[in-house]
Amino acid sequence: MSSNKLPTSKYDLSTYWGRVRHAMDITDPRTLLSTSQDLNSAVKTLEDYGAGKIAQLDETVWHAKKIVDSTLHPDTKEPVFLPFRMSCFVLTNLVVTAGMLQPNLGTAGTVFWQWMNQSVNVAFNSANANKSTQLTLPQMTKSYIYAVSASCGVAIGLNKIVPRMNFLSSSSKAVLGRLTPFAAVASAGVLNVFLMRGEELRQGIDVFDKEGESLGKSKKAAFYAVGETALSRVINASPIMVIPPLVLMRLQKQNWLRTRPKLTIPVNLGLITLTSLIALPLAIGVFPAREKISPFKLEPQFHHLKDKSDQPIVEVEFNRGL
């Protein structure tokens, strides 16, 4: 009985659209309904396919892979805590995002929702990071405090500055006021990723050959991984934090919503949910989760390695994390 090698994805990950379609599988909220029994069955299906007990790569195998990829961490092979799986990203962030987008929050409200947002960010960054290098509890606590302080500082500062921009019209001030949460979220989100994954930058992350064998740790690979993740966070936040408030401003001028103010929050939540579901896979797909790179872009120790066949290694891989 011959063994089978399971492809990394059902889709072509060398293309943006292929990565988006793969991300749609990973972020599909329906996978959250999978039970422990479903997960165990999916793992066994993949093992049976790898062992050659299942000959054909059909939809049953692909569905099993979808459950496994959306539930287990690629490094530890352990289930990610459900609220912080990428398939739960939209649902977990929904309440926090809606809270931050409320107009006229005031200082206390701004601080509270930025604190909530960064707490969720810390949890997602920690749960989905590259696990070859991990933060200690004191390091995580310090990074958490830094990220929360930065986001609150940016948000409060912008809330104070915008009303004082007397050269702007009242409508322009209103638009900037609605976009203040985005500036805070984007800047703090980048800082959060770099702080929560700072140990990866200091120690490096595991780099692998095409057979999955570790070749050692690379700080340069870590910089690529963390930098791309931070950028994807900004790309993801942009439509979510910009489109709903601007559309809502437009809708609030319509008679049907102006005469029914109680519908404002449900409409806002609907806009946020729809935008989030569309934006998340588009943002994740910008960069491959399993990044391939020339060893000559890394440290000298990776430049002239050879594989088991004594052939030069011309491409290495690392897990970027989500």
Swiss-Prot record:
- Membrane-spanning parts: 143-163, 175-195, 229-249, 269-289
Q: Name one GO cellular component term.
A: mitochondrial inner membrane
Which membrane topology describes this protein?
Multi-pass membrane protein
Q: Which InterPro entries match?
A: Mtc (IPR004686)
For whether the record's keyword set contains Membrane, the answer is yes
| GO terms, molecular function | L-serine transmembrane transporter activity; monoatomic ion transmembrane transporter activity; transmembrane transporter activity
Would I find rRNA processing among this entry's keywords? no
The family database entries (Pfam families) matched by this protein are listed as: SFXNs
Q: Which UniProt keywords apply?
A: Amino-acid transport, Membrane, Mitochondrion, Transmembrane, Transmembrane helix, Transport
The GO biological-process annotations, alphabetized, read as:
mitochondrial transmembrane transport; serine import into mitochondrion
Where in the cell does this protein reside? Answer: Mitochondrion membrane
- Report the superkingdom from the record: Eukaryota
Task: Please report which protein family the annotation says this sequence is part of.
Answer: Belongs to the sideroflexin family.
Q: Mind telling me which PANTHER family this protein's record contains?
A: SIDEROFLEXIN, SIDEROFLEXIN-5
Q: What this chain does, per the record?
A: Mitochondrial amino-acid transporter that mediates transport of serine into mitochondria.
Q: What is this protein called?
A: Sideroflexin fsf1
Q: Which organism is it from?
A: Schizosaccharomyces pombe (strain 972 / ATCC 24843) (Fission yeast)
Give the gene name: fsf1
